[in-house]
């Protein structure tokens, strides 16, 4: 199985690590923006050294209470980082739901659009469908980032999320997008209770029946804090544990902050697999 993207046909014959890059601008001044972009690009280089297979660059935080970032601010934060990252030799994903940002980063050579709204914003589907080859990750989110936890989902969570993702993929395919360009993300932490998030993990293998690769994003999520009592900056170990559990249950890609630790843990996991080679 391969994931077709703008510049790469990404083999999914082993678990891949997607490293998170924060490109939120510190200020609108040129100096502040340049300094932030330089730090983000240095972080990209470090993540690649640590073993990241894919970079995921985002200019807007989806956490509740995070300051709003408008279109101009997001473009100012993301574009300089994408411009530099596309020459680093690995696929570049951009975490955005704005069609204007999607179009701009694809014009710069970005490979993947990673959208928490699953292309539900007006014009977003058309941007992806009109591109000849970009990859896309469609995520499930209940409601929106500001209200998703005020009234979480109820009922059969696995069935609802599966149905949403399948319908989203089918809608995109109906616009001419080939299925091998699509990856699905159940959306851990986006409008679900702690119990529901872990239910998605426990039943994650059921999503594989729909025929699309899966991305799992457990890194530093509040559900990990709920079961460990650890603050967000102390959640590296549970994040790695969740990534391993997700891979064990069939996830093809794990989206993480702690790339080096996740890669090391996956090396141990891989060594224990049947017919594993112990030499990297």
Which ranges hold each PLM region?
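Catalytic-pocket segment enriched in acidic/His residues
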Residues: 25
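Short acidic capping loops at alpha-helix termini that bridge into adjacent secondary structure
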Residues: 178-181
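Catalytic domains of carbohydrate-active enzymes, especially glycoside hydrolases
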Residues: 42-58
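Hydrophobic beta-strand anchors of alpha/beta hydrolase catalytic cores
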Residues: 17-18, 55
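SAM-dependent methyltransferases
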Residues: 1-15, 280
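Active-site-adjacent loop and "lid" segments of alpha/beta metabolic enzymes
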Residues: 12, 29-43, 62-81, 87-91, ...
């Amino acid at each position: 199985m391969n994931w077709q993207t703008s510049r790469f046909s990404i083999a999914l014959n082993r678990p891949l690590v997607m490293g998170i890059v924060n490109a939120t601008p510190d200020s609108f001044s040129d100096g502040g923006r340049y300094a932030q972009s330089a730090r983000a690009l240095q972080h990209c280089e470090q993540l690649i050294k640590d073993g990241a297979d894919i970079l995921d660059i985002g200019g807007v935080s989806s956490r509740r209470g995070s300051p709003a970032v408008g279109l101009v601010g997001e473009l100012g934060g993301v574009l300089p980082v994408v411009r530099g990252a596309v020459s680093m030799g690995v696929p570049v994903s951009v975490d955005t739901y704005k069609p204007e940002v999607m179009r701009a980063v694809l014009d710069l050579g970005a490979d993947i659009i990673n959208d928490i709204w699953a292309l539900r914003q007006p014009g977003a589907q058309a941007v992806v469908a009109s591109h000849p080859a970009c990859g896309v990750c469609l995520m499930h989110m209940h409601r929106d980032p500001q209200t998703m936890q005020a009234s979480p989902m109820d009922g059969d969570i696995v069935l609802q999320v599966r149905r949403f993702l399948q319908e989203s993929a089918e809608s995109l395919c109906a616009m001419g997008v080939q299925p091998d360009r699509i990856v699905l993300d159940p959306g851990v932490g986006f409008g679900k209770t702690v119990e529901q998030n872990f239910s998605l993990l426990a039943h994650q293998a059921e999503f594989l029946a729909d025929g699309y690769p899966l991305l799992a994003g457990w890194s530093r999520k509040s559900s990990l804090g709920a079961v460990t009592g650890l603050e967000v900056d102390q959640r590296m170990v549970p994040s790695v544990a969740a990534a391993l559990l997700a891979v064990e249950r069939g996830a093809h890609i794990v989206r993480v902050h702690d790339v080096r630790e996740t890669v090391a843990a996956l090396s141990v996991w891989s060594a224990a697999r049947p017919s594993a080679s112990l030499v990297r």
